[in-house]
From Swiss-Prot:
PANTHER family membership: DNA-DIRECTED RNA POLYMERASES I, II, AND III SUBUNIT RPABC1
GO molecular function, one term: DNA binding
Cystine pairs: none
UniProt GO BP: transcription by RNA polymerase II; transcription elongation by RNA polymerase I; tRNA transcription by RNA polymerase III
Organism, as annotated: Acanthamoeba polyphaga mimivirus
A GO term from the CC aspect: virion component
Functional summary from the UniProt entry: DNA-dependent RNA polymerase catalyzes the transcription of DNA into RNA using the four ribonucleoside triphosphates as substrates.
Catalysis: reaction(s): RNA(n) + a ribonucleoside 5'-triphosphate = RNA(n+1) + diphosphate
Protein name from the UniProt record: DNA-directed RNA polymerase subunit 5
Superkingdom of the source species: Viruses
Keywords on record: DNA-directed RNA polymerase, Nucleotidyltransferase, Transcription, Transferase, Virion
Predominant location category: virion
Cellular localization per UniProt: Virion
Entry's EC annotation: 2.7.7.6
Length: 205
């Protein structure tokens, strides 16, 4: 898959890539959920409405409003980030959008950068991760996010806990895609030759 990504990166202009990246970020956010006042899980946003109402702030910064009222500030940087100084583009972005949830997309970055962004209510991704939607891959199983009450039901039904459930690590692309937290449980549905579909669960560690 890497050669295809490289070809796409070469063939597309930066402005074209920004459009693709934003479309896939909005798709990702649309696949996330929030819990409403009744305790029910709802899609974080409607992708069509979110794209139509997205606000451009200049310098590849875009604001996306979620249906639960959260505001997401998205910053696309076409370079590798190796350090963050007080006067850096990243620091200025984090300071200006301190009260927002933040998504940064860059060519590459170090592990220390990832940790720093997480501590500032943000996520950072590599450019190639948003040149296609992760869940649109035909070989991906289906994933279902669970509400807190659904997680408790799984624990009760299967007599499960974080020690007995199968694990998925926080660095996994799926965990990052859904912004899952430690001890969250996700349902995985795969095709099965015997039962039509197989259902499994993973807990984030």
């Amino acid at each position: 898959m890497e050669p295809n990504k490289s070809i796409l990166q070469i063939m597309k202009s930066n402005s074209d890539k920004v459009k693709i990246i934003l479309g896939n970020i909005i798709t990702m956010l649309g696949n996330r959920i929030y819990i409403d006042n009744n305790g029910d899980s709802k899609p974080l946003l409607d992708p069509t409405n979110a794209f139509k109402n997205m606000e451009e702030r200049g310098d590849n910064v875009f604001i996306i409003k979620a249906d639960n009222g959260d505001l997401y500030a998205v910053k696309v940087i076409f370079q590798k980030i190796t350090a963050i100084s007080k006067q850096s583009v990243i620091s200025e972005f984090l300071d200006e959008y301190e009260t927002y949830k933040k998504i940064i997309v860059t060519k590459d970055y170090t592990g220390k950068i990832d940790t720093f962004i997480l501590r500032n209510s943000g996520q950072i991704f590599k450019e190639h991760e948003f040149l296609a939607d992760l869940l649109s891959n035909e070989f991906q199983p289906r994933f279902q996010l669970l509400s807190p009450s659904e997680m408790e039901s799984v624990k009760t039904e299967y007599n499960a806990n974080p020690y007995t459930l199968k694990k998925i690590v926080r660095s996994d692309p799926i965990v990052r895609y859904f912004a899952l937290k430690k001890n969250d449980i996700i349902r995985i549905i795969r095709p099965s030759a015997t039962s039509g579909q197989g259902i499994d669960y993973r807990v984030v560690v």
